[in-house]
Amino acid sequence: MKKVQRYFLDYEFSKNNKSLEIKNENSFKIILNDKKNYEINKFFYKQIGKDHFWRDRLVWTDKQWLKYSSNPLLDTWILKDNNNDLIGYYEIEKHDNKEFELINMGILSDYRSKGFGSLLLDHVLKQSY
């Protein structure tokens, strides 16, 4: 069995934080999965997770996926290009004490190493304050 290591980021905002500058920012969009479509979460988890040993939710039924993605405290953001091709996503959960937890974030394999992960992380940080 391969050992998986988890990392945690505790980030405090200051006025000195700068946004990433992304070239051709009009060629993509980051949208909220406001319809709470569990199939989006399931698709990304399986596709991205197979390369990163995400296993916990592989046994979930559609009912479990629906319950998870319907959580009113959970937001799923989707990165798409202008052709509506999926690029990546992240799930963020709000907590009572004005904290946010980044549950999952990932980029589909065809789009990795092109700066999209940095773009999503920048979006995560902007959404959390």
Regions found by a protein language model. Name each.
Residues 1-29, 34:
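Acyl-donor-binding surface of acyltransferase catalytic domains
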Residues 11-15, 94, 109:
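Non-catalytic surface loops within mature trypsin-like serine protease
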Residues 22-57:
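Short amphipathic alpha-helix that is part of the acyltransferase structural core
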Residues 38-42, 66, 118:
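An amphipathic alpha-helix signature
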Residues 42-45, 69, 125:
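A generic alpha-helix structural signal
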Residues 58-63, 69-108:
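A conserved beta-strand-loop-helix scaffold within acyl/acetyltransferase catalytic domains
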Residues 107, 113-128:
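Conserved acetyl-CoA-binding loop-helix of GNAT-fold acetyltransferases
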